[in-house]
Amino acid sequence: MKSLKSFLIWGIVVLVGLASFTTLALSRGEQVSAIWMVTAAISVYCIAYRFYSLYIANRVMQLDPNRLTPAERHNDGLDYVPTHKGVLFGHHFAAIAGAGPLVGPVLAAQMGYLPGTLWIIFGVVFAGAVQDMMVLFVSMRRDGKSLGDIVKQELGTVPGVIASIGILMIMVIIMAVLALIVVKALVHSPWGTFTIAATMPIALFMGIYTRYIRPGKIGEISIVGFILLMLAVIYGEDVAHSSFGHWFDLDGIQLTWAIMIYGFVASVLPVWLLLTPRDYLSTFLKIGTIAALALGIVIVNPTLQMPAVTHFIDGSGPVFSGALFPFLFITIACGAVSGFHALISSGTTPKMVENETHVRMIGYGGMIMESFVAIMALAAAASLDPGVYFAMNSPAALIGTDANTAAEVITTKLNFSVDAATLLHTAKEVGENTILSRAGGAPTLAVGMAHIMSRLIPGEAMMAFWYHFALLFEALFILTAVDAGTRVARFMIQDLGSIFYKPFGNTDSIPANLVATFFAVALWGYFLYTGVTDPLGGINSLWPLFGIANQMLAGVALIMCTVVLVKMKRDRYVWVTLVPAFGVLFVTCYAGLQKLFHSDPRISFLAHAGKYRDALASGEVLAPAKDIGEMSQIIFNDQINAGLTALFLAVVVIVAVYGFRTAMKARKVGWPTAKEIPAVYRDGKQPEAQHEA
């Protein structure tokens, strides 16, 4: 009876999913509700988590609840701290969910809602969530070692050192882009800056409360923390208009220094004091807002106004250059698969897992949650008037700086009808002077969310409130990835430094921690500063590099996981990581080669640098540069971006070659050769027998 009931329930879920995808894919010309995107995603997520993640946990990984985790064995109260799975899920989700799932899908909406929807949903099931879960498992079995250290341990010293250097540089770019999105959202926004600043003392209070005042009382401090957070959000507007509001009214360079200082402090304090409670606190706002947006989509039932597929799949779009293949995949980035997650899954999280069986919920479940965020972002963007969408995301050099010119260009050149009155009215609704050329994706998502939420909770000026609340939400969403990422970068630098000076790798050494943290913050802080001062706006230069770096890192992580499975003598399951590894690497390497060698200056870093170099030689100044100095800066930035792309490609090729060689050697040996830490079992218990999924 129970099996019949289960069969019927899952049969209904499958039918709902099929109906949703059929409606999304086959509707042409008629109006399509955004609800179909939500139901399609939820159906696939439920099926994947119930069956595929269980298959991986029980058969591929063979998780053992009686095996002590690194957090239990070391428990130093600093980095290794056994943490309740609900709290750790919040920390992990807050750490991995950065700019990618919010910004990438919004930019990808240029090509229509269907390509992005398909990649976000199926990419996460078979690649993104698999990577997160597998890397977390592999790292835990090696005392929470970093990705670079695991590559060195399992593939050899040479590929390990090369991978560690490449991974660190990839991490630096990712951190810089995440921080840049925050800066763009908070520039001269005292309301948002105050609210985010307020989360820090609130988090310190929560950490001290659960550590010393009421240990283990997660429920009650969660309620207190949530109330304090809501008060900070609500009264942030009053603070912004008060006599000391100017303290929080910062420009881009001031915010850059503030974020760098915060990243340094957060990385050296014990995780229980600031990092974990702050991320847990941020998760309330993150999940709550996304849940409210999903509820708003269901109740308001907005129509997807963007076509399923637009004519910009040929690469001629104004938002980002390049054809659907391969640039859609690197643009969406974290919404489907993210190499950054591999750094968190081999950084802070494996040192805090309370029981090995929690890997499934935290690793696979956390990534599914992020993918759902990406679907919500895509739905919000696709429900906007396409004319408004392209007005917000097209460069000023194309559409101009006034509403009349923009409306004419969008209607005649981009073939999406919009009038100047609509653009002016939208700007007035959200309390802005203009919405033209608000690139980066975050403002577009904020307008989309505001349109939906203001219809869910109507009232005078609610559109402006929800717009600014959404910008705040996005900044808080992203900043939590910056603090965790800085700590991970610290671990990576210490791992690298220990090759030359072994005591430097001691994470208990305060001087070593401080020096490594300084270098980590200085590296990503440099690229953040160049992004803030970039004549092209920073996002335009760094986002493509971010996408390529992020996906290449995912490929490296999946190669490592594949080699580990071979060395564990689980060859029959190697397809679980090998297939997504091949797919991710093929797409990303192809994109990387185009960014280097394509002849179109809109696509290639080198071609773009050549165009500006030729103009500079003839004494010409090309927009958006205003003088010769900015022309030289653009050329230098293009050359740096091209050099980093070449470095990332070289790292991936080297790791792939060594991975293949290592796997072939391991297959010839008749016993497992994976270098796990010897198992220690809870209360003298023996390993638990594994069950089929």
Predicted regions: what they are:
Residues L18-Q31, G100-L102, L114, V172-H188, ...:
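Transmembrane helix-loop junctions in multi-pass membrane proteins
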Residues I297-I313, I368-G448, A484, Y529-D534:
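Extracellular/periplasmic helix-exit of transmembrane alpha-helices
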Residues Q31-R50, L54, A108-V138, G148, ...:
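Extracellular loop-to-transmembrane helix junctions
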Residues T22-R28, S33, D79-R142, Q153-T157, ...:
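Membrane-interface helix-loop-helix modules in multi-pass membrane proteins
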